[in-house]
């Protein structure tokens, strides 16, 4: 675990653009009933957010860590929007009108501004262009550079 340098949505695998083909996990034994309850709660939340059949990579941008922002940037964010020392990327995107935006067959969900969906035969170029458009809008309004959670291949 320590050798992989895991941190929020990051690791050596991601930094070095490694692709994992196989993994083995050693887990500690826990309270079975408590773990089942936690799994069910998590699945309920995920199924509300990511309906079965949606063609999407999950949340496109990482949430922004408060520790990485200046006082000037933080002044633009309502305190109630800071959750666990992070600012949800979905909040920032919603504030710049991302919900429901489209480019070709790529659409940002009307119910979640950080959920980019392929509605048919969307292209990687449309996906990239739409993400960059709203990354720029967030930067202009909040002075915050959103970081992609999705790994982009062939784009910079």
Predicted segments, located by residue:
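Phosphate/pyrophosphate-binding loops and the adjoining catalytic core of nucleotide-dependent enzymes
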Residues: 134
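Phosphate/pyrophosphate- and phosphate-bearing ligand-binding catalytic cores of soluble enzymes
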Residues: 1-126, 141, 145-156
